[in-house]
């Protein structure tokens, strides 16, 4: 009997098992995308005071050996209470590894100090070697901190090389020498760009979009404002006829205005650098923003100084929480990348030695 199905096989159609039907609805879009999300800080001064005072006491009892544990507890508290899109930050550094690095760093410091008592030449060589190691120290410290920092399940990663660090360091020296320090803001910009342009969260890359003139404005406007105030005070006194009546009083008034200006100029610079940096930083296609007010920031820093002095340092935790909360909660992120797609990069473990050498020799590598 003739079977027509064998003679004319059934043609596969798009709805057959060989050609599954295309989904009628597109993949679900992450509802977080396209919105501006604000950072939040959940810490409190009372909680941090408990951590801070215990850290101080244990460092005294252990002659400073508890310092790595104190550092990790402090960073974990601040990181762990910082939140963005319902994800918390975390610091995963291991205290005993930091302790080993600190002991080696202290050993280097002791050797240089002892040698300096017997040979000026050896001391100079030691200082020069340490100075030449600064780019390596900075780069290694940033890598260590990034490797041990997390956002949700995504680790941070720093890809800057030693070659790039030394090239930036050399350019900074040349610029500083040939401009007699007048272009110091350019050095700040180069350092910020080196740090941020090589920083990743998972596989999402940070980028600093600001140019060096933005940092010149950020740092020199407070300076011009300071000298403008001094000039205005001088003109007002001249118009009031005080210049010739009481020159001694005039000198003291200028000294007071000068000291007040110096008291305000650095916090104002710090505020403007903070604003310039974060309003011009992106991570992949997502963009950071800050509504930080430069005068509010300056007020917080100055009053923190006053409160810490009047309280003999006991209000240090309150001051630290106050400033950090303002910085964090002024930040927001216009999210254009799916945070669920963050994939960690393969990283090697990094030594804490460089960070501890930086701490011992007071080399500031903060962002």
Predicted segments, located by residue:
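Low-complexity, intrinsically disordered extramembrane tails and loops of integral membrane proteins
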Residues: 1-40, 333-367
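Membrane-interface amphipathic/juxtamembrane segments adjacent to transmembrane helices
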Residues: 36, 71-95, 142-154, 340
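Interfacial aromatic "cap" segments that immediately flank transmembrane helices
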Residues: 38-58, 90-111, 153-177, 203-231, ...
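Hydrophobic, aromatic-rich membrane-embedded alpha-helical segments
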Residues: 53-73, 131, 170-190, 302-322
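Membrane-water interface of transmembrane alpha-helices
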Residues: 65-78, 133-147, 183-199, 267-278
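Membrane-interface alpha-helices
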Residues: 70-86, 187-205, 319-339
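Membrane-helix interface segments in multi-pass membrane proteins
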Residues: 71, 109-130, 229-266, 270, ...
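Intrinsically disordered cytosolic tails
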Residues: 260-367
């Amino acid at each position: 009997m003739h079977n027509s199905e064998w003679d004319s096989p059934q043609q596969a159609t798009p709805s057959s098992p060989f050609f599954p039907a295309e989904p009628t609805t597109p993949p679900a879009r992450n509802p977080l995308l396209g919105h501006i999300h604000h950072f939040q800080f959940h810490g409190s001064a009372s909680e941090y005071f408990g951590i801070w005072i215990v850290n101080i006491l244990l460092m005294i009892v252990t002659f400073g050996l508890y310092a790595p544990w104190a550092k990790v507890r402090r960073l974990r508290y601040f990181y762990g209470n910082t939140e963005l899109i319902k994800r918390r930050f975390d610091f995963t550094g291991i205290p005993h590894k930091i302790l080993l690095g600190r002991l080696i760093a202290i050993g280097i410091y002791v050797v240089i100090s002892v040698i300096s008592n017997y040979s000026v030449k050896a001391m100079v060589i030691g200082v020069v070697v340490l100075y030449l190691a600064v780019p390596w120290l900075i780069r290694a410290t940033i890598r260590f901190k990034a490797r041990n920092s997390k956002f949700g399940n995504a680790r941070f990663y720093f890809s800057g090389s030693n070659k790039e660090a030394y090239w930036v360091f050399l350019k900074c020296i040349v610029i500083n020498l040939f401009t007699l320090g007048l272009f110091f803001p350019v050095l700040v910009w180069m350092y910020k760009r080196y740090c941020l342009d090589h920083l990743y969260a998972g596989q999402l890359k940070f980028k600093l979009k600001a140019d060096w003139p933005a940092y010149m404005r950020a740092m020199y406007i407070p300076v011009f404002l300071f000298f403008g105030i001094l000039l205005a005070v001088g003109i007002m006194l001249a118009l009031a006829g005080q210049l010739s009546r009481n020159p001694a009083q005039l000198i003291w008034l200028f000294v007071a205005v000068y000291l007040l200006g110096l008291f305000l100029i650095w916090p104002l610079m710090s505020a403007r650098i903070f604003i310039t940096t974060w309003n011009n930083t992106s991570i992949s296609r997502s963009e950071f923003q800050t509504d930080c007010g430069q005068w509010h920031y300056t007020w917080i820093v100055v009053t923190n100084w006053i409160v810490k002095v009047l309280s003999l340092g006991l209000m240090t935790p309150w001051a630290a929480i106050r400033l950090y909360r303002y910085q964090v909660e002024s930040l927001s992120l216009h999210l254009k990348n799916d945070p669920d797609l963050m994939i960690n990069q393969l990283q090697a473990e990094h030594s804490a030695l460089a960070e501890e050498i930086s701490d011992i020799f007071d080399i500031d590598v903060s962002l």
